[in-house]
Regions:
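Active-site microenvironment for binding and transforming phosphate-containing groups
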Residues: 1-181
Length: 182
């Protein structure tokens, strides 16, 4: 299963999947609610543009978590989660979608890529994040596993998508699940 350790930098707190920390080219983290600028019921690290927060607050929160973890927010690619098992193959053309460019896709609960520098982003409340890294093929995946996705085997579907797209072998993929918050 692997461990998640709490990390903090410049007042921003996140969780890091320790098995991935030493993997070359992998930058990852699971944000917490700590270290952002949002106020009131959205306090403080709100990363949703659809919850009624001011857009500049959400953008600043992304800048803060990006600086803490070590990526550029303009490299983000968002999912569009609707509790499906749909996986999107993310390419260079997707860079910034959801953050600097509008999404031009819907119903995507998993993202896979082999493009260095792209940052995949999925979002969670009480669902489970699934992380996938193929260190041989230099491919990664990230899936949102709610109860529907779990029942319909989104983890297996993500691994199969990586195999189909990048030639990943299941035995080479390092996978971790995050925690559900209920």
């Amino acid at each position: 299963m692997g461990t998640f350790e709490k990390r903090e930098k410049n007042g921003v707190t996140w969780l890091s999947a320790t098995p991935f920390e030493k993997m070359e080219g992998i930058v990852q983290g699971f944000s917490t609610r700590l270290g952002g600028v949002s106020t009131e019921h959205l306090s403080s690290m709100n990363l949703s543009f659809s919850r009624g927060d001011q857009e500049e607050n959400v953008r600043e929160n992304f800048r803060r978590i990006a600086d803490a973890i070590g990526f550029t927010p303009e490299d983000l690619v968002f999912s569009d989660q609707t509790h499906t098992t749909n996986i999107r193959v993310v390419t260079e053309a997707d860079r910034g979608k959801g953050f600097t460019k509008p999404l031009d896709y819907t119903d995507v609960d998993g993202l896979i890529t082999d493009v260095p520098g792209l940052v995949l982003a999925t979002f969670y409340a009480d669902c489970v994040p699934l992380y996938f890294v193929d260190p041989i093929r230099k491919a990664v995946g990230l899936s949102h596993s709610g109860w529907r996705g779990t029942v319909h085997k989104i983890g297996k579907i993500t691994v199969q998508a990586m195999a189909d797209q990048y030639g990943s072998r299941p035995e080479d993929i390092v996978a971790r699940s995050g925690r559900a918050h209920v």
